[in-house]
Amino acid sequence: MEKKLKSWQGWLLFCGAMAVVFVLGLVVSSLMERRAETVSVFNNKRVEITGIEARNEVFGENYPRQYETWKETAKTDFKSEFNGNEAVDVLEQRPEMVVLWAGYAFSKDYSTPRGHMHAIEDITHSLRTGAPMDDKSGPQPSTCWTCKSPDVPRMMEAIGVDSFYNNKWGAFGSEIVNPIGCADCHEPTNMKLHISRPALREAFARQGKDIDKATPQEMRSLVCAQCHVEYYFKGDGKYLTFPWDKGFSVEDMEAYYDEADFADYTHALSKARILKAQHPDYEISQMGIHAQRGVSCADCHMPYKSEGGMKFSDHHIQSPLAMIDRTCQVCHRESEETLRNNVYDRQRKANEIRGRLEQELAKAHIEAKFAWDKGATDVQMAEALKLIRQAQWRWDFGVASHGGAFHAPQEIQRILGHGLDKALQARLAISKVLAQHGYTADVPMPDISTKEKAQEYIGLDMEKERKAKDKFLKTIVPEWLEKARANGRLAKL
């Protein structure tokens, strides 16, 4: 005989089913509302944008939520144990770096990076870009603008890529005026992610890859890889090029540069032909566990947020440590304190090796100069200079990637460890050269305990540099901005 449900059990089952249907209805309704709001955003644009629109404020008319969070990249109120979003004078913290960059503009000025909204201001105020008083003077090429503004692809389209690169930095001061923003990463009509800089596309092509076949998730990293990479200025035309032809590793790129017989500069003390790493964030991140598991840059640096029923990417691009609840804890269940300390532990270990490497490498440069002064020959110094080049390339590659100690901690420690080994080998090679010239005592070391003392030691006239920059900022930059406003390059909303 079949067992019948009691009356109250039937009613309980009925009510439970109704509750499930009700909840599902709410979920579907919420999803439909979100979709409707998303469609509404695209169908009710206040401004029709076509072509390359460099003025971020114009995009803000159509996408106010994204725009308002992007403006927060102007903030300088976050600080972690090793990084943050305010400009900190790294040369003041680590005066050995002045010696490592002797003969190169970075020995004058190097600070931690601020947010994207400061891109134009920071490069304009940097002592590295000099004080050009006209379109034809100054120490830097216009290639230095490449990653600073959506005005760059606009200018490339207008005058050609080669012509853009093959100019002085000061030549486009009145054109490159809007900081890193919307058009750098998005198509204007549908906001689809796109590649706006030629170097990344060209690097893929040389590897036999079609970047247009990248998945949407891959694009959430590749738009960052347009700039957060290692690159160099190739040839007299200063053509921006990624040295990826042999691979992503520090050894692969070194082999590429060696084959091309390339050096960024000749060191003022040691005479070593130095490679200056830029910021190989993308390459190093690809060697880490997160990228290998399919996590993109935007997943951690631009997490989703909800507002008014609308889900969108937070365009306040910053360290995930500033918002652990929306980044790390989306996947990891540990406490904020535990996760933060996990990051710091990796960074502390890498920085321990970094500090030792900087000290040994600075001594190697100083000792090499001492050997030259004692009459060393090119043949005698060849091995030491090769080792110095290799050591400094590994140091800079590891240090220039600001998040490398977290993105790929094992790889960063390997790179810095190899750099330290080569720096010590260089010092040993120099000691043998000195012995050949009858010198066996310790090489006297200058006082480079502060940035100012180190800059004086390598022969910089910093007062002259600052005075020239001050004049440039007070006379030339206002002219650039006035011309930009007159030509409609800055928004008037």
From Swiss-Prot:
Binding, substrate: 231, 279
Binding site for heme: 144, 147-148
Record field: catalytic activity: 6 Fe(III)-[cytochrome c] + NH4(+) + 2 H2O = 6 Fe(II)-[cytochrome c] + nitrite + 8 H(+)
Superkingdom assignment: Bacteria
Keyword annotations of the record: Calcium, Electron transport, Heme, Iron, Metal-binding, Oxidoreductase, Periplasm, Signal, Transport
Residues that bind heme c 2: 182, 185-186, 315
Record-given protein name: Cytochrome c-552
